[in-house]
Amino acid sequence: MESQQLSQHSPISHGSACASVTSKEVHTNQDPLDVSASKIQEYDKASTKANSQQTTTPASSAVPENPHHASPQTAQSHSPQNGPYPQQCMMTQNQANPSDWSFYGRPSMIPYTPYQMSPMYFPPGPHSQFPQYPSSVGTPLSTPSPESGNTFTDSSSADSDMTSTKKYVRPPPMLTSPNDFLNWVKTYIKFLQNSNLGGIIPTVNGKPVRQITDDELTFLYNTFQIFAPSQFLPTWVKDILSVDYTDIMKILSKSIEKMQSDTQEANDIVTLANLQYNGSTPADAFETKVTNIIDRLNNNGIHINNKVACQLIMRGLSGEYKFLRYTRHRHLNMTVAELFLDIHAIYEEQQGSRNSKPNYRRNPSDEKNDSRSYTNTTKPKVIARNPQKTNNSKSKTARAHNVSTSNNSPSTDNDSISKSTTEPIQLNNKHDLHLRPETY
């Protein structure tokens, strides 16, 4: 009796259970031979209905929602969602397909992980050439890179180079302002050098030392995204990424050029503020130097107006050009070209006066002889003697005798001798007398 009662109630209970099933398959342990044919048909209809309901259900509703991948976008969006950094995966070069998501300007569309969350890139091979970060879970980006001795696999190598395979490379800081981008690039380049990737950094001519590989480009692309958020990038960087969102090498090359340009700007400002000119160099060369500096500064966004430029130029003038400070200081609308017209006029006048002066140069040996012969600065007295003295050389006694004999002759000559000594004495040269000029 009990077995018959169980067999009578079991189909009813089984049928009620089957009516509430909504899964793909109906599982039962009861022998289908114990069920009547009408009940079997009912079971088949219920199973068919359940299958038809499942086919119309969206695939997303059958998958439980992951709370870690919650996205602010709508459910109809089929693009990758923006989730927290620790829950997303590193992007590979093959995944960076423009047809899947947009360029780097929308980083929320590109999944990647922070540098601390995944091992650092190293090329395939038996020995790793690059240090690796430990894959710790939940490490925020603001957490500094491990630097203590406990994080190293070999504590005895604590004083070795940063590029050792048993040490960790300190990541660059996060970019927080577009104005700090060039300074951030310096730290990012240092980060690449410490990671044994210095060969891919563009040089002064804009080309790297060696060709970058696909894996290195992927690492460069991902690390740049992590530490340089798009909202803090300058406009010129966004313009490059809008054309090719993976061209990080071009960004580094342009950054190095801008760094050199900034250094040149500082040098130009210092040169312009310390100008010196005294006519020792041609005026054309001086004008070319100054105008090139002013043009470079104006092209780089540092505008130097005529008033400031003229003041800097006139402050460096010296010599004959110094008076231009006072003749032109009241001309407020004076231009640099007008100032250089005055400088050219003075320079040409100097050159003309130098060419017109005769150039007499004495023999250096004569100057030495003169300095040795004459020590006194006064000119020595020159005595001119009568050339007939050598032919009529007589003694003083003979000349005195002739004078005494001439006094005995009665002539007008005696009267002339007896005249006052203040009058000039005129003697006839009858007796062959020769007097020195200084005896008068």
Swiss-Prot record:
Positions bearing the site annotation: Cleavage: 401-402
Transmembrane portions of the chain: none
Assigned GO CC terms: cytoplasm
Compositionally biased tracts (Low complexity): 153-165, 402-418
Compartments, as annotated in UniProt: Cytoplasm
Induction or repression: Ty1-NL2 is a weakly expressed element. Induced under amino acid starvation conditions by GCN4.
An annotated Gene Ontology molecular function: RNA binding
Pfam (any one): TYA
Source superkingdom: Eukaryota
Renumbered residue ranges of the record's region Disordered: 1-97, 129-171, 352-440
UniProt keyword annotations, A-Z: Cytoplasm, Phosphoprotein, RNA-binding, Transposable element
UniProt GO BP: viral translational frameshifting
Residues covered by region (RNA-binding): 299-401
Keyword RNA-binding carried by entry: yes
Keyword match RNA-binding: yes
Compositionally skewed regions (Polar residues) per UniProt: 1-23, 48-60, 71-97, 129-152, 419-428
Basic and acidic residues bias (residue ranges): 429-440
Modified residues (Phosphoserine): 416
Anything else known: Retrotransposons are mobile genetic entities that are able to replicate via an RNA intermediate and a reverse transcription step. In contrast to retroviruses, retrotransposons are non-infectious, lack an envelope and remain intracellular. Ty1 retrotransposons belong to the copia elements (pseudoviridae).
The record's note on its domains: The C-terminal RNA-binding region of CA is sufficient for all its nucleocapsid-like chaperone activities.
Role: Capsid protein (CA) is the structural component of the virus-like particle (VLP), forming the shell that encapsulates the retrotransposons dimeric RNA genome. The particles are assembled from trimer-clustered units and there are holes in the capsid shells that allow for the diffusion of macromolecules. CA also has nucleocapsid-like chaperone activity, promoting primer tRNA(i)-Met annealing to the multipartite primer-binding site (PBS), dimerization of Ty1 RNA and initiation of reverse transcription.
Subunit description: Homotrimer.
Stated name of the protein: Transposon Ty1-NL2 Gag polyprotein
Protein species of origin: Saccharomyces cerevisiae (strain ATCC 204508 / S288c) (Baker's yeast)
Gene: TY1A-NL2
